[in-house]
């Protein structure tokens, strides 16, 4: 079972964040600076009063290590690990991968030195490359039944825990659209590329001159977004791999591949209505979030990981943000126009070579605790 790539579009509600990103503080003049020096940072406390999880008391005193390649969640992982230790007696040391280092290179070097982490947060491709030789088999773990559609199987076995389910498309600010048009906005009413353009034109006529935020970062415009031409081949990871191999083998001519031309058509639309059209290389990521939250724009070509930026820019959890698909054509029946892309951006692999039985058991319990305990 390959991980599911296309998920049903959520037509209302918050853009929920599964990762926390840091603001750079850079400004390029597109909007006002949202930073308030008097603002207090507030945290939602974790309710630890209810905990029905059954801990294995024989594991108390065990220490395990977790290699973290997702810097945005380092602090959260440390706090969660501390809570787990209070309950279980198992110490979890969260080891960050140095910014700029390759997670794959890091974990391989640790294996070569004979000191691999008990568990490692890695990219899916890293797990596929390493699992059969180095990982513990997780096929029988209880959380597997809860993760159907997001699991990565390697020759019929599960070697990793799916983490950070992230989706992307066109984020909308519902209140901005409704205020500009003077009517309620139903995201389900926009089903094609032409209908999206019609909505954009209506917003322009209503006074929002450039209703789209589109940041300059190459990881967003290239690495994240160009994947659509593969992922929308037939909507699964297997299909994406199939079209990639066909293109590499010369069976499909990329220049005439319909998903590429459709992708570029939509990209041209976003460029036309881009708030930073006059200076696209000055379109700082954080400024795009500010413009969306302030109502200067109504849409942002991005993923759910952008929520912390939008929140920092002034949005609240009570505001209505959501996703529209990245519309590829005018075919209402095309799944690409009905869904957004979503998949686990990271996987947790457990060491099956060096870790002791107790360490493996503690790492497995930690993963189950994340899923099944009220605290986790």
Segments (PLM) and residue ranges:
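Short, solvent-exposed loop/beta-turn-alpha elements that line the ligand-binding surface or hinge
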Residues: 136-150, 179, 188-189, 232-262, ...
